[in-house]
A protein has these predicted regions:
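Catalytic cores of the polymerase beta-like nucleotidyltransferase superfamily
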Residues: 1-197
Length: 197
């Protein structure tokens, strides 16, 4: 079955396809499109680029009349802010130099560790959609969405970045999903670290 992407992706897709670079939509944009039949315009859309995201981000901002913001030069992460219908949409670009599989392994929860090659996105009536068969899902995120469970990608997901605890709670409240036992245990074990953030 097909799932619709938020309208703001249309603008960016046309541009990315014209650039002949291998890139993927990752994380929340896929998750939200699957969970909600009418994906609302979310704050940001994550894009993993096999190449230098900082260079591509600058080019994108210039071509689309957006604002370029460098978030993490060392890891090649930047943001392009575009105005669409009086709203701002953030596109966060990451350099995925070691391939998309490595990129997903470093993500927080299985339901965010999914990717979609932009080549597999179809246009239909003014919007864009994708088929579940084309979603890269090495950690079982689709199954966890179906079962309404938040599960960390690895045993060290939370301890490596304690802020993810807050993200788990936020996702849990927003979608009324359960946090898995293993992930709850990780949260408990790293709760002392959150004060250091």
């Amino acid at each position: 079955s097909n799932y619709t992407l938020p309208p703001s992706t249309t603008l960016i897709l046309n541009y990315l396809r014209s650039q002949d670079i291998k890139c993927f939509f990752v994380g929340g944009v896929i998750r939200d499109s699957i969970i909600s039949s009418k994906p609302h315009e979310q704050g940001d859309i994550d894009i993993a680029i096999e190449g230098d995201a900082l260079i591509e981000g600058k080019k994108m901002a210039q071509a689309l009349g957006g604002v370029y913001v460098e978030l993490d030069t060392k890891h090649g992460i930047c943001r392009v802010v575009l105005k669409t219908d009086s709203k701002q949409t953030y596109f966060d670009l990451t350099s995925s130099n070691y391939g998309i599989a490595t990129d997903l392994k470093d993500r927080d929860f299985t339901l965010n560790a999914m990717a979609l090659n932009i080549e597999h996105i179809q246009a239909c009536n003014q919007s864009h959609s994708f088929n579940l068969a084309n979603v890269l899902d090495p950690f079982g995120g689709l199954g966890d969405i179906k079962n309404r469970i938040i599960k960390s990608v690895s045993e060290t997901s939370i301890i490596n970045d304690p802020i993810r605890t807050l993200r788990a709670i936020r996702i849990s409240q927003r979608f009324r999903f359960q946090i898995s036992e293993e992930t709850s245990e990780q949260i408990k074990n790293s709760s002392s670290l959150i004060t250091n953030v």
